[in-house]
Amino acid sequence: MIEHPKGNFFFDTGLGTNIDLQISNNLSFFARSVVKYKKLTTVKRELSENGLLSNSIDFIIPSHYHWDHVSALSDFPNTNVWITPSEDNYIFSSEAKAPNFIKEQYNSKTTKWKTIKFNPIPYEVFTESLDIFNDGSLILVPVSGHTEGSVGLFANLKSGKRYFFTGDVTWDVKAFQRPSEKHIIPRKQVDHNTELIENTI
């Protein structure tokens, strides 16, 4: 959870309380044998254990809509969920298929969708950006490639520390430093557009 005086939000949700059903309802026997996950504490339970209610979350920004990043959306009904237009168009299309996309996780009628509209304001190496609270502390940028409309988040702390949350653009910080993409096998399985990924990195 990211806490800010103007609102609290999740950047991705991880696995939710209904992950077992989501997997069994939507993946074939073969896919279930390949897709592995380990259930740890859900974000909903983390909130409860820290004395917070689910409505403590003002909105959710998934970096992208793969199953392991949005499973817990169903644990927060009636919450504002942010999405880019390109991601929105893709995840509800016939091209978005399991195991990468599980529509049951994000097609709830109770979800309150909010479209992410980037401004033509450069930030670092990105030509567009969105200052979430208009104070320079939390900046969204487009990082398309892993999915059609993936987003990354810069968090600039008062201490001077900076963090860049990139979703699954890469799985290793060294990939940004080299730069390099994922191994060819997982890249073909999970990345939507390898050319865009290469440009992003």
Which residues does each PLM region occupy?
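Conserved beta-strand hairpin/beta-sheet module of binuclear metal-dependent hydrolase folds
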Residues: 1-44, 153-169
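Active-site neighborhood of phospho(di)ester-bond hydrolases with catalytic His/Asp-centered motifs
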Residues: 10-14, 59-64, 83-84, 142-145, ...
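Metallo-beta-lactamase
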Residues: 35-52, 56, 85-144, 148-201
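Short, solvent-exposed loop/turn and secondary-structure capping segments
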Residues: 21-22, 72-75, 93-94, 176
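Solvent-exposed loop/turn segments at secondary-structure junctions
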Residues: 15-17, 65-68, 88-89
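Active-site metal-binding motif and surrounding structural segment of the metallo-beta-lactamase
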Residues: 25-83
